From Swiss-Prot:
It comes from the Eukaryota. It is found in: Nucleus speckle. Keywords: Nucleus, Repeat, TPR repeat, Transcription, Transcription regulation. The gene is ctr9. This is RNA polymerase-associated protein CTR9 homolog. Residues 889-1157 are annotated as: Disordered. Residues 1057-1068 have a biased composition (Low complexity). Residues 1091-1109 have a biased composition (Polar residues). It holds the Pfam family TPR_8. GO terms for molecular function: RNA polymerase II complex binding. GO terms for cellular component: Cdc73/Paf1 complex; euchromatin; nuclear speck.
Length: 1157
């Protein structure tokens, strides 16, 4: 079937030349015809495209190149054909550049395409086809994706359904990781043209994979294969999906798909790389290398090349060809994108193999940046940084390993690595990490704990001071090492040696020096080159004070290693300890001359200390002193430059500043060092020295004392001397003396201490002797101490150490002591005389005190006798008054008896509530009263005497009432439930003597206001004084109380308000005695009625009872007691009667008696 033809018009004629597409002539022939006939440009382009379709690309290029020059442009719209010609040729060059593997040729083709597109821009810039071609060219260049996006966008704005523009936008979105956007563009293109090629389905499948929609991706790849069975991309996509299922059948299907793709396109780099990966896991490394190399050479895409190099590198890695592996890993990292970090992981391993930890760390850091929580990477980085000297990196390692142990708590290696990092900074957590590793080994792995871990745990306990635990672990490590020696004798014997050395150090800490010495020597017998054993033996000898033996051991170490810095340092320290500054200085300078130890910090500090020490020696050469200061300062600065955190160098700088006189600056330096660490004793001492210089003696003393407590288990004579100096300066000589004596007990032969003790004794003695108030004992003690100081100074002036103090000063002080001793007799005599005077004065004072004491005793005795006499007189007066009162009561009772019998009514009595009558209750006759009172007198003071003794005076009565206040019941209480047991016991006796009631005559009704009852009480608290019993406080408002009580009382319905003021008599001790007092009260009532009957009788009664002032007052109080009885109280011992009320009631009673007459 003919594919068609094209007609070429002949010039200046109407004839044409027809060229059949199936029989196209050579390109050059066609070009000559077209040139000869001056053919229009669009015919050139059509012929060129036909040549391209037939695969004749050379003729296609020749035609288009010739058309650019010779094409006829004399027709309408020739600009569009001219642009099409340029764009078509440029698109061909772009396609060729995409396929070209040679970089130079590719660059040349891209340059030609760029030139052609630029020329086309000048003709028609915004043509859609032109813009599409140029956008595709930008995509090929890779770094012009934004320009391509803008051009595709411009086309879509003009033609929203333009399929090339949609596919271009989809490609750009996919590369920008906007997979949803890319999928949307692919879908729109597919809807616009459902007959799109398989590549559109392939792009959709890749989008579905990125969106994790694997089922849809599988369908898309399958549909692409349906449309194009030879679509390699779809086959590879399906193969990868199958391989990722990680099942045997799926893997088999995936490999078959890859094989099919390889059959279709054996040079496809993607297929080759996937097959290489498959054969790597099949351990067919030769095929891996063949396929990966083939893939590498068949692609110019760097991502593909990186994959190929990685496959090659790991195949060589697993075959332990580390040089080839390193080469390909490195090449892969050059091609790889930022997200492809597997080559960096392998390259890091190669660097570790080569010992280049720095580059290895950089590689793994790149991996960790892409995958922040990758377990293997964090573990490797932690291990690398753990061995670093940089503390920051060690902190990073600690952080990584902590994350590893959190993600995988059973990783023993990670726990051990973490413990090793923590050993230097956090011993407790290091022990915890080792404990976790040990537990995992024993419980999870079911394995024995390695001797290395046991040794490390023991060393940590040793550092913490847990010597018992450390010993246990060291012994366990030795046992494990012996057991494991069967498998690797050489290795585990070396472990045993290290553990034995540690055990010997432990015995040193336990002060078992014999055991440690034995272990060190055993190690040296087996390993004579173990230098540390020589050094420890020398250190033990040095601590015992055997400097020569120590020096021999250190020299033995130098026989093994002539340049061993520790041995030279220890020898230098021996010289410094003996104050041999020159030889010591040479030893440290020798260390610094060695290339390997030219910056040795310890040696530089020791040299600085030597120069600093020379400043303490007395010298008059100021220039020399300044040179020494500058040298020391320069050395300390050099140490700080090498190690900015060296606190000892900073402390040295502070000391030099203090020597130069910059005391404030020195104190600031020392304070900063002390803030950084409180574990350096020198800093504390230097601060205390500064305080002394600033005359802050109290602060200095506190600092010295704190330093002694914190750093020195035993008394340190040097620090004690500093403390004594501070106390001496602040004038505390006694405390200074005690401190110096402590130091003397430690170092009795120290001449400096002896000099200072003598000086303090001399000053103390001088103060005591000059003080005129000093007693004889103090003066004698001062003379004794002065003599001791004199002997000390004399001794020191002859045999003292010239290097430590001036002997002439001791001679001068001895002479001063001698002068003071020559004056001592005067001070002793003065003190003795003063002491004798004081003794005489004390004797005289004692005698005066004794006389005064005897006088006071005599006065007290006389006063006591007078009180006894007065008491006897009072008792006699009381007895007389009681007797008179009884006689009076008996007489008046006999006089009143006939009249009462006439007035007495019936046996019944009217209720108090009616308020019509008051009842008078009579008790026994006079004959029955006397025996009852006699019985009471036998038991003590009679109740009658107590009751009537209260009549001595109204003032006395009130005092007694205030002192004997009782808890009160509410006014108007109806019950007497709180009667004491005594009153209940006496009630039957009262019933045997029936009360004789007597009605008040009607003419007396409402006129008799109150009656008093004179009672006697057995209360001993009134000291046998007489008292008026006021019944106003014990009144009950209800007449029903009468039957329950055998007491005789006057019941009145008047003055109820006053009665309400009285309280309850419950619990009163007098209540139990009222039955005995009723007979006296009866006589008193009879007498009062008779007195109220006539004024003459009343006057006669008053005269008979008024034999004395006291008796007159008693009678008056008795009348007042009668008025108190009107309140209805049945407690005759109550003490609440008021004087004013009593006077008013007396007047009322008298008026009532007048009316009754």
């Amino acid at each position: 079937m003919s594919r068609g033809s094209i007609e070429i018009p002949l010039r200046d004629t109407d004839e044409v030349i027809e060229l059949d597409f199936d029989q196209l002539p050579e390109g050059d022939e066609v070009i000559s015809i077209l040139k000869q006939e001056h053919t229009q440009l669009h015919i050139w382009i059509a012929l060129a495209l036909e040549y391209f379709k037939q695969g004749k690309t050379e003729d296609f290029v020749k035609l288009l190149e010739a058309a650019r020059i010779d094409g006829n442009l004399d027709y309408r719209d020739h600009e569009k054909d001219q642009m099409t010609c340029l764009d078509t040729l440029a698109a061909y060059y772009v396609q060729q550049a995409r396929k070209e593997k040679n970089k130079d040729n590719k660059k040349e083709l891209i340059t030609q395409a760029t030139l052609l597109y630029t020329m086309a821009d000048k003709i028609i810039m915004y043509d859609q086809n032109h813009l599409l071609g140029r956008a595709c060219f930008c995509l090929l260049e890779g770094d012009k994706m934004d320009q391509a996006d803008a051009q595709f966008h411009f086309v879509l704005n003009q033609s929203p359904n333009n399929i090339p523009a949609l596919l271009g936008k989809a490609c750009i979105s996919f590369n920008k990781k906007d997979y949803r956007g890319a999928l949307a563009y692919y879908k729109k293109a597919l809807r616009t043209n459902p007959g799109c090629p398989a590549g559109v389905r392939l792009g959709m499948g890749h989008c579905f994979v990125k969106l994790n929609k694997l089922d849809k991706a599988r369908l898309a790849f399958g549909r692409a294969l349906d449309l194009n069975p030879t679509c390699v991309g779809a086959l590879v996509g399906l193969a990868v999906l199958e391989l990722n299922n990680k099942e045997a059948d799926s893997i088999k299907n995936g490999v078959q798909l890859l094989s099919k793709a390889y059959t279709i396109d054996p040079s496809n780099p993607m297929v080759l790389n996937h097959l290489a990966n498959h054969f790597f896991f099949k351990k067919d490394y030769s095929k891996v290398q063949h396929l990966a190399l083939h893939a590498f050479h068949n692609t110019e895409v760097e991502a593909m090349q990186a994959e190929s190099c990685y496959q090659l590198a790991r195949s060589f890695h697993v075959q332990e060809d580390y040089d080839q592996a390193f080469q390909y890993y490195y090449q892969a990292t050059q091609f790889a994108a930022a997200s492809f970090v597997l080559p960096f992981f392998g390259l890091g391993q190669m660097y570790i193999y080569r010992g280049d930890k720095e580059n290895a760390s950089q590689c793994f850091e790149k991996v960790l940046k892409a995958y922040p929580n990758n377990y293997e990477t964090m573990k490797i980085l932690g291990s690398l940084y753990a061995a670093s000297d940089d503390q920051e990196k060690r902190d990073i390692a600690k952080s990584h390993l902590k994350k590893v142990t959190e993600q995988y708590p059973d990783d023993v290696e990670a726990w051990i690595e973490l413990a090793q990092i923590l050993e230097q900074t956090d011993i407790q957590n290091a022990l915890s990490a080792y404990g976790t590793a040990t537990r995992i080994l024993q419980e999870k792995v079911q394995a024995d704990v390695p001797p290395e871990i046991l040794n490390n745990v023991g060393a940590l306990h040793f550092r913490l001071g847990n010597l018992g635990e450390a010993k246990k672990y060291f012994l366990a490590s030795l046992d494990r090492a012996k057991a494991e020696a069967e498998h690797d004798e050489h290795y585990y014997n070396s472990i045993s040696v290290t553990t034995s050395y540690n055990l010997a150090r432990l015995y040193e800490g336990l002060c078992e020096f014999h055991e440690s010495e034995k272990l060190y020597k055993n190690i040296l017998r087996e390993h004579p080159n173990y230098v540390d054993c020589y050094l420890r033996l020398g250190a033990m000898a040095r601590d015992k004070g055997n400097f020569y033996e120590a020096s021999d051991w250190f020299k033995e170490a130098l026989q093994i290693n002539q340049d061993h810095p520790d041995a030279w340092s220890l020898i230098g320290n021996l010289h410094l300890a003996k104050q041999e500054w020159g030889p010591g200085q040479k030893k440290f300078e020798r260390i610094l001359k060695q290339p390997s130890t030219q910056n040795d910090t310890y040696s530089m500090l020791a040299l600085g200390n030597v120069w600093l020490q020379t400043l303490h020696q007395p010298t008059r050469d100021r220039e020399k002193e300044k040179r020494h200061q500058d040298r020391a300062l320069a050395i300390y600065k050099q140490v700080l430059r090498n190690d900015s955190k060296n606190l000892f160098a900073a402390n040295g700088i502070g000391a030099v500043l203090a020597h130069k006189g910059y005391v404030r600056e020195a104190r600031d330096v020392f304070a900063q060092v002390r803030e950084a660490t409180a574990d350096i004793s020198d800093v504390w001492l230097n601060l205390a020295h500064i305080y002394v210089e600033q005359k802050q003696y109290i602060s200095a003393v506190q600092m010295y004392e704190n330093c002694l407590r914190k750093f020195y288990k035993h008394q340190n004579t040097e620090v004690l001397l500093y403390l004594a100096r501070a106390l001496f300066k602040c004038g505390k000589l006694q405390e200074c003396k005690q401190i110096l004596l402590k130091a003397r007990h430690v170092a009795p032969n120290d001449t400096v201490l002896m000099f200072n003790v003598a000086l303090v004794l001399q000053r103390l003695a001088t103060l005591v002797l000059k003080d005129e108030k000093s007693n004889l004992k103090a003066v004698l003690n001062a003379v004794k101490e002065l003599e001791l100081a004199h002997r000390y100074f004399n001794y020191l002036s002859k045999v003292g150490d010239k290097m430590r103090f001036d002997l002439a000063l001791a001679t001068s002080e001895a002479r001063q002591c001698s002068d003071l001793l020559s004056q001592a007799q005067y001070h002793v005599a003065r003190a003795r005389k003063q002491d004798e005077e004081e003794k005489e004065m004390r004797t005289k004072q004692e005698q005066e005190k004794e006389v005064l004491r005897q006088k006071l005793l005599k006065e007290q005795e006389e006063k006591h006798l007078r009180e006894i006499e007065e008491q006897k007189k009072l008792l006699e007066q009381r007895a007389q008054y009681l007797e008179k009162t009884r006689n009076l009561l008996s007489f008046t009772g006999e006089m009143e008896t006939p009249k009462e019998k006439k007035q007495r009514g019936g046996g019944g009595r009217r209720s108090k509530k009616n308020g019509e009558f008051e009842e008078f209750v009579n008790d026994d006759s006079d004959e029955e009263l006397a025996p009852r009172k006699k019985k009471r007198k036998k038991g003590g003071s009679s109740s009658g005497e107590q009751g009537e003794g209260g009549d001595e005076g109204e003032g006395g009565e009130k005092k007694k009432k205030k002192r004997r206040k009782r808890p009160q019941k509410a006014a108007g209480s109806d019950d007497d439930e709180e009667q004491t047991p005594q009153s209940k016991k006496r009630q039957p006796k009262k019933k045997e003597k029936p009360a004789k009631l007597e009605r008040t005559p009607p003419s007396m009704k409402g006129k008799i206001k109150s009656k008093a009852i004179i009672s006697s009480s057995e209360d001993d608290s009134d000291e046998d004084k007489l008292k008026i019993a006021d019944e106003g406080h014990a009144r009950d408002s209800d007449s029903d109380d009468g039957p329950r009580k055998s007491q005789k009382r006057v019941i009145s319905d008047s003055d109820s308000d006053n009665g309400n003021k009285s309280g309850s008599d419950a619990g009163s001790p007098q209540k139990s005695q009222r039955s005995d007092e009723d007979s006296d009260n009866a006589f008193a009532r009879k007498r009062r009625r008779q007195i109220s009957g006539s004024d003459n009788d009343s006057a006669q009664s008053r005269r008979s009872s008024g034999g004395s002032d006291n008796e007159s007052r008693a009678a008056s109080n008795s009348a007042e007691s009668e008025r108190g009885s009107d309140r209805g109280s049945d407690n005759e011992g109550s003490e609440r009667a008021s004087g004013n009320q009593s006077e008013q009631e007396v007047e009322k009673s008298e008026r009532g008696s007048d009316e009754s007459d």
